[in-house]
Amino acid sequence: MAKALPLISCDSWADSINEEDVEPKFKYHRLANDLKYMLNADVITCSAVHLKFLIFGTFRGRVCIFDHQGNSVYSNLSASERHTHQVAVNNIDVDHKGEYVATCSDDGKVNITGLFSSDNNHSLSFGKFIKVVSLEPDSKAHIKRFVVGDDKLILYERNLLKKLKPVELCSVEGSVLSICWHGNFIAWASHIGVRVYDLNERCSLGLIKWEVPPQERLENFRCHLRWSNKHTLLIGWVDTIRVCVIRKRNSIEASTGNLPVYIVDPISTFQTTFYVCGLAPLSAKQLVVLGFRKEKSSCFKALRPVLCVIEYKMNNSEEICTDSLTLRGFEEYTVNDYSLGGIIEENRFYIVAPKDIVVASLIETDDRIEWLIKHSKFEEAMELISANGGNVPVLSVAKLYINHLLALKKYDDAAKLCLRMLGNDKVLWEEEVFKFVKCQQLRSVSAYLPTSDECKLDPHVYEMVLYEFLKFDVCGFLNLIKEWPSHLYDGLAVINAIHDNFRKHYANQLLESLALLYSYQGDFESALRMYLKLQNKDVFQLIRRYELYDVISKLIIPLIQLDRDCAFEILLDKKKIKTEIVVHQLEHNQEYLYWYLDSLLKKDPSNVFQKKLISLYAIFDRNKLLPFLKRSKDYDIQEALVICKQENFYPEIVYLLGCMGGVEASEALNIIIHRIRDIEMAIEFCKEHDDSDLWNALINEFSKHPEIVTKVLDGIVDYFSPAVVVGKIKMGQNIPNLRQSLIKMLRHYNLQGEILSSAQQIQLNDYFEIHSEIVTTQRRGQQVSYEQLCSLCHRPVLMAGTHLYCIIRLECGHVYHKPCIQGELLKNCNECNLWKLTVGK
């Protein structure tokens, strides 16, 4: 079983050289089990990774096979006690099916070994160092071909006699350093660069020259070749990576000479900050690269190797993440001691060192979730679970996130998260709410608590929230009372809590809260009293909503004090509250009674309480008293007179005395003359009553005052004989403007005579004109047709032998036979009873 190691740790074998909060791409574990025994006794010099197993070549020349967990696997390789090679194994290759293994060594041998069959085993001895060998990868091939590289590139295949036949493919500049075979293309590296050989065309597609590193030899660095697909070749050599595409030449390129069908096109070339120890494809534009750092430690030792994910573009690249790996003995290794194998289908990569093997697996969803949680990236973890699923429930992450936010005192964010994640789960809500209780931050979650019938929490939860608001935020407490349905909590318990924690500084908010709570409980009288203490006009809305007209009978004065207009809007409606009740309540507040009765008079002019307005108008608004006395008849004149006399309201007294008539009218005139002293008013008073005694009294009084005689003369025209006034003037008495006044009076009488004469003449003219028109109309003939019937006998009016004088036609248009009416004169038409008889013929 593979031993699991910490993902990334400075003290362990893998550290991230990025910032700690950057999400890793890989998780790592070290291979152990049977493999560790081999590593204790020997050193790995080369390796091959297959989908089924792992094969390692050692310094002592052995070839060992293990499963992916490091357990030894029995095969033909392990059946033999002898070493496969005499010295260190240089290269291992496995066919696609995992049936044959090819190895080579400095002992000059190349061995082709069937793991489970010996039918096609071969052992070739070249008598010189053999660095690379490669099996044909084609899984459909029954007869395996292989390529050996020394100072030439040689293909071995069977002839007709089933014997191996060597075919020299290419001569080599120096020696073959690396081979990678895929389909019909063989990529191989020499001392000057990389070539691709086309087996179908039996030709090289060209040389990709490689830059020689300064103060180094190119052959001192292992060239790493890998096909990411059948037309894309990855090359990593020294500190340069090149991505090449094998494509067919276009028509223009193919026309320029005898050239191969295919061409090698480098599509991306970039340098790294380290030496390349191996590479593999990760995605369309990403590579996994094992690197050896160029720098040395302070002790001039090698630094830890790095595993990078690089995203490449045309001629540049970007390191997505870089992990520094602590492998056993790394300080003593060189760049060629490391290799990178991979199972691309499973995104699993093997970092192979002489004394250690570490597996890097692309981090899975659950691993990512674990890392995100560990680094407090809860939001990203929940998004990942929502998108890709996983073994960790999203609610578990949400709970951890809530705890984290509460620890950071981000209470509002935690509350919003509750709303988003807890849904309508009552149990979850109650569980999470108690976390806010411990922080005394129920106020933060209050706006998000479920209040619907689908998810109603325990009343105790809502009460705890209200108590916290009552303690720390009275305004917020009031808002909750307004917003929350009253059935969520025990209203009486909250009312008691307010009384126990009443603070005068927040009296307004607490009184309004009590008013609302009392109304929720149906105790409307208490609610009204709270509103009135508060002087809150919402009391009127409450009265209308719940029709509390019986309740307000004892609260009329406070309601008027709060808002007179709103109060009267209710009090003036007899259907809601009786007038008698209102008047009784206002008896001891004369001003409010005046306001009420004055408003009531406008709405109900015949109300029985209007007589009280006389004394009220006398006190609060005298200007309304006289119009009221003139307009209303439902009061006692004597009582009104007493009130007016007490206040010396002379115009009102004059009006009342005038209404009484007789002696009282003379008293009224006397008041006008001696108290009010208004001649025009006196004249108008006499005109109104048209009493000769009043006129005589007026004339006698004012004849003593020459300066106002002319005013009397002007005023009495058409009402009293001016001769009486003139007769009262004494001989030799000087009357200002008398002449003008007399002329004016005479002209007035003259004008009246002319108007009367003209009116008579006009009337006579109209009479004669209308009379003439009537006579003319009555003499005019009337049409009678043959279709008309007698309205009595219903026979045609005009028949043979009928005399015209025997027909009678009425104004309404109906006609009769004269014999039918038996000689009687019709006063009305029998048909329509509308017109009198007008014409008889």
Curated annotation (Swiss-Prot):
Q: Which GO terms describe its molecular function?
A: zinc ion binding
User: Which InterPro entries does the record cross-reference, listed alphabetically?
Assistant: Clathrin_H-chain/VPS_repeat, TPR-like_helical_dom_sf, VPS41, Vps41/Vps8, WD40/YVTN_repeat-like_dom_sf, WD40_repeat_dom_sf, WD40_rpt, Znf_RING
Recorded phenotype for the gene knockout or disruption: Impaired autophagosome clearance in fat body cells of starved 3rd instar (L3) larvae. Accumulation of Notch in photoreceptor cells and boss/bride of sevenless in R7 photoreceptor cells of developing larval ommatidia.
Cellular compartment(s): Endosome membrane; Late endosome membrane; Early endosome membrane; Lysosome membrane
GO BP term, example: regulation of SNARE complex assembly
Supply the alphabetized keyword list: Autophagy, Cytoplasmic vesicle, Endosome, Golgi apparatus, Lysosome, Membrane, Metal-binding, Protein transport, Transport, Zinc, Zinc-finger
Entry annotated with the keyword Zinc? yes
Q: How does it sit in the membrane?
A: Peripheral membrane protein
Per the record, the zinc finger regions (RING-type) lie at 790-833
Q: Which GO terms describe its cellular component?
A: clathrin-coated vesicle; early endosome membrane; Golgi apparatus; HOPS complex; late endosome; late endosome membrane; lysosomal membrane
The UniProt entry annotates CHCR repeats at: 570-711
Which PANTHER family does the record cross-reference, listed alphabetically? VACUOLAR PROTEIN SORTING VPS41, VACUOLAR PROTEIN SORTING-ASSOCIATED PROTEIN 41 HOMOLOG
> Which family is this protein grouped under?
Belongs to the VPS41 family.
Other remarks?
Answer: The name 'light' was given due to the eye color phenotype caused by hypomorphic mutations in the lt gene.
Assembly, in brief, is: Part of the homotypic fusion and vacuole protein sorting (HOPS) complex, composed of Vps16A, car/Vps33A, dor/Vps18, Vps39, Vps11 and lt/Vps41.
Function comment: Part of the homotypic fusion and vacuole protein sorting (HOPS) tethering complex involved in endo-lysosomal vesicle trafficking and lysosome biogenesis. The HOPS complex facilitates docking and fusion of lysosomes with late endosomes and several other types of vesicles. The HOPS complex is also involved in autophagy and crinophagy (the elimination of unused secretory granules through their fusion with lysosomes).
This chain's protein is named: Vacuolar protein sorting-associated protein 41 homolog
Q: List the source organism.
A: Drosophila melanogaster
Q: What is the lineage of its organism?
A: Eukaryota, Metazoa, Ecdysozoa, Arthropoda, Hexapoda
